[in-house]
Design a protein with these regions (language model features):
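Substrate-binding cleft and catalytic face of glycoside hydrolase catalytic domains
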Residues: 24-25, 61-169
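N-terminal carbohydrate-binding accessory modules
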Residues: 1-71
Length: 169
């Protein structure tokens, strides 16, 4: 059987991806964190918790591993519930932490790619009807504007939604 030779263009991004809910730990009040606490939420009744402890600083270890394996990009998400825990409250220290992560990637020669929404919603947003609320686009646009404004100096690549069809179905 002949071997296939694949060529990738110069500048092709090799990397990996994460989701805030899956790696950060210390989960804020989101629809997923609430669901995970329900007895019927997970088959074996395990509960969400520390995850990979990125929020406590272990992201540095993973970024070092990405650098050691010559990755050139890393997609991470910003946890909306962490940045905007209540409709009229913004957590600036949380944005500072995400900024620190993006700086860490850039210092390692890794291009950050930020996903603004990776499946989870703030609990206040879910309690107001989530994406079925006619104000949902307004809420999300304000969140996105604030995050992009805070992080744009450290990130050139953005994804609005991870798997948007999950909500459409």
């Amino acid at each position: 059987m002949p071997k296939a030779i694949m060529y990738f263009p110069a500048g092709f991004l090799w990397g990996s991806a994460t989701a805030a809910y899956c790696v950060e730990g210390a989960s804020p009040a989101s629809d997923w964190s609430e669901w995970g606490q329900q007895p019927e939420g997970v088959l074996d009744e395990s509960k969400p918790g520390r995850a990979c402890e990125w929020w406590s600083g272990r992201w540095r270890e993973d970024f070092d591993r990405a650098q050691e394996t010559h990755q050139t990009a890393l997609r991470l998400s910003v946890e909306w519930a962490r940045v905007q825990p209540e409709p009229d409250r913004w957590d600036e220290p949380a944005l500072d932490r995400y900024r620190e992560m993006l700086i860490g990637l850039n210092q390692r020669g890794i291009s950050p790619l930020v996903c603004l929404h990776h499946n989870t919603n703030p609990l206040w947003f879910a309690n107001e009807g989530g994406w079925e609320n006619e104000q949902a686009p307004v809420y999300f646009a304000e969140y996105a504007r604030r995050v992009v404004e805070a992080l744009k100096a450290y990130c050139a690549l953005w994804v609005t939604f991870s798997a948007p069809n999950a909500y459409a179905l």
